[in-house]
From Swiss-Prot:
Disulfide bonds: none annotated. Belongs to the RecO family. It comes from Hyphomonas neptunium (strain ATCC 15444). Pfam families: RecO_C, RecO_N. HAMAP family: RecO. It comes from the Bacteria. The keyword Magnesium does not apply. Keywords: DNA damage, DNA recombination, DNA repair. This is DNA repair protein RecO. The gene is recO. InterPro entries: ARFGAP/RecO, DNA_rep/recomb_RecO_N, NA-bd_OB-fold, RecO, RecO_C. Involved in DNA repair and RecF pathway recombination.
Length: 243
């Protein structure tokens, strides 16, 4: 069997003498792994940095077995452009670790995340853009994997205006007036997550990351008895203003 596709590099690990088992998110096949002969060599190492997009071909006997990747060319080198931006590098590490931890090999949901992930990665050089986009991407990750939040209407009244909080129990939005008696037990819902025209206010990114992180940890990683990847924890600490 064989196929060709573009893939976002999620990571890799050494195998044997100079080999590399490469982990990628492909446009059509979702998350896939394959062996790249000589992939750990100094000459080839740079193109396999996490976050880069490469054109590759996969060959194997059976689709569910580890096959071989032949890399045709590097489509986009992103990692090297972020070397002087620790926050963007932290976001890149969080993105790839969440995809590696949240997607199974060949998971069809991976294909639905390819374009959104490409868009986010391409914006990591724009510090005024990517933080809000990143939080929206995490919401999309939850939705694509069947753990989406319901932010369309109030869980109590059914109203679709004035939504200010999210219930940690149900993942549903709550209107401000209904949320008031329980506000200390709810997550704040930043306006930019329900209205794309809303300004991103101070504290909104941190609030958004706490919201999505809770459900990613509890619903996605909790289902397999794992916590959030440490890369995701480091991102929250890096972009959360000190108290």
């Amino acid at each position: 069997m064989n196929w060709s596709d573009d893939g976002i590099v999620l990571g890799g690990r050494r195998f044997g003498e100079g080999g590399l088992i490469l982990d990628v998110l492909t446009r059509e096949k979702g998350r896939r792994s394959g062996l790249v002969y000589g992939g750990a060599s100094r000459r080839k190492r740079a193109q396999f940095e996490a976050g880069n997009t490469i054109a590759l071909s996969w060959t194997g006997r059976l689709d569910d077995q580890l096959g071989r990747f032949d890399v045709a060319e590097a489509r986009k080198d992103r990692a090297s452009r972020l070397l002087d931006d620790p926050a963007a590098l932290a976001a890149l590490s969080a993105i790839t670790s969440l995809l590696r931890g949240g997607l199974n090999e060949g998971d069809a949901a991976g294909s639905s995340l390819y374009e959104a992930t490409t868009l986010l990665l391409d914006q990591l050089t724009e510090p005024n853009v990517w933080p809000a986009l990143y939080v929206r991407w995490e919401l999309g990750l939850l939705s694509a994997l069947g753990f989406g939040l319901d932010l369309d209407e109030c869980a109590v009244s059914g109203a679709n205006d004035g939504l200010t909080h999210v219930s940690p129990r149900t993942g549903r939005a709550v209107r401000g007036s209904e949320a008031e008696p329980y506000v200390d037990r709810l997550f704040a819902l930043p306006s930019f997550l329900i209205d794309p025209r809303a300004d991103v206010l101070p504290g909104d990114i941190a609030a958004g990351l706490r919201l999505t992180g809770y459900f990613i940890e509890g619903r996605l990683f909790g289902s397999v008895h794992r916590g959030l990847p440490p890369e995701r924890e480091r991102l929250l600490k890096r972009i959360t203003p000190p108290a």
